[in-house]
Amino acid sequence: MAEENVIYVGNKPVTNYVLAVMTQFSEGADEVKLVARGRAISRAVDVAEFIRNNVMPEVEVKDIEIGTEEIETEEGDTISVSTIAITLAKPSE
């Protein structure tokens, strides 16, 4: 998957990310990956479900990857942050 088909989900409203996914698909992408970590995970799930249920019902969830990243804080401590990557795909025609 090309790097431009990856959408990093953060603190913006869900509709911004829905629009980004729709733009990727309308420009010819077969797959779009939503990547989020920490508190943004629920927002990434909301985006995927909104796309599937309201905007593009033909889109399927192809893959879901979950994991943990080790991040070093400014104080030098190491914390673990949960991550998710949801791959949405148009069905093959």
Curated annotation (Swiss-Prot):
Location in the cell reads:
Cytoplasm; Chromosome
The family database entries (Pfam families) matched by this protein are listed as: Alba (PF01918)
- Kindly list the biological process annotations in GO that this record carries: chromosome condensation
Q: Which UniProt keywords apply?
A: Chromosome, Cytoplasm, DNA condensation, DNA-binding
Tell me which GO cellular component terms the UniProt record holds: chromosome; cytoplasm
Q: Which SUPFAM superfamilies match?
A: AlbA-like (SSF82704)
Report the principal subcellular site: cytoplasm
InterPro entries cross-referenced by the UniProt entry: Alba-like_dom_sf (IPR036882), DNA/RNA-bd_Alba (IPR013795), DNA/RNA-bd_Alba-like (IPR002775)
The question of whether DNA-binding is a record keyword is answered with yes
Q: Which GO terms describe its molecular function?
A: double-stranded DNA binding; RNA binding
Protein family membership: Belongs to the histone-like Alba family.
Its biological purpose is as follows: Binds double-stranded DNA tightly but without sequence specificity. Involved in DNA compaction.
Give the protein name, as stated in the record.
Answer: DNA/RNA-binding protein Alba 2
Q: Which organism is it from?
A: Methanopyrus kandleri (strain AV19 / DSM 6324 / JCM 9639 / NBRC 100938)
